[in-house]
Design a protein with these regions (language model features):
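Short, ordered, surface-exposed loop/turn motifs in non-cytosolic proteins
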Residues: 37-72
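C-terminal motif of bacterial Sec signal peptides marking the signal peptidase cleavage site
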Residues: 13-16
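Structured interaction patches on ligand/partner-binding surfaces of diverse proteins
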Residues: 100-130, 137
Length: 138
């Protein structure tokens, strides 16, 4: 009887453990990365769009929490259609980001992150993230 009680206590202890966000699940996060090429209209001074382009070969990073200051846990390089996906994820909060490049007034190039947040609330789910749109000035 004492052994049965110990086994039941251990079983309850293991079943009560909530696994954190990360790999080991059955859900997917997917999305796309676009570049938008713009230029400054000389007659109006406004920024006008030249064209959209799918951004292939762009790294998209994932953090297994909603904390943007943590180091990334995994990355995915977009395919020829600018698509990425992270598979085998558990329920939880996730942060995705990619880098956009920019030039300041002194012609110094620098990268800055663009963040997206998503929550997986059920197993076996496909979760789409709003597209990353990276502006490229001409």
């Amino acid at each position: 009887m004492k052994n049965l009680l110990i086994i039941c206590a251990i079983a309850v202890g293991f079943s009560a453990c909530e696994k954190p966000a990360g790999e080991g699940g059955t859900s997917v996060i997917e999305g796309q990365v676009y570049k938008i090429h713009t230029f400054q209209n000389s007659s109006t001074g406004a920024m006008d769009t030249l064209y959209y382009q799918l951004d292939s070969g762009k790294d998209v990073f994932i953090i297994y929490s909603d904390n943007e200051t943590e180091v990334y846990d995994d990355k995915f390089e977009t395919d020829y259609n600018g698509r990425y996906n992270f598979e085998y994820l558990r329920k939880g909060d996730y942060t995705l980001y990619t880098y956009a490049d920019s030039i300041d007034v002194n012609n110094v190039n620098y990268d800055y992150p663009i963040f997206k947040h998503i929550k997986i609330s059920s197993n076996n789910s496909n979760n789409s993230v709003e597209d990353f749109v990276i502006e490229k000035n001409q």
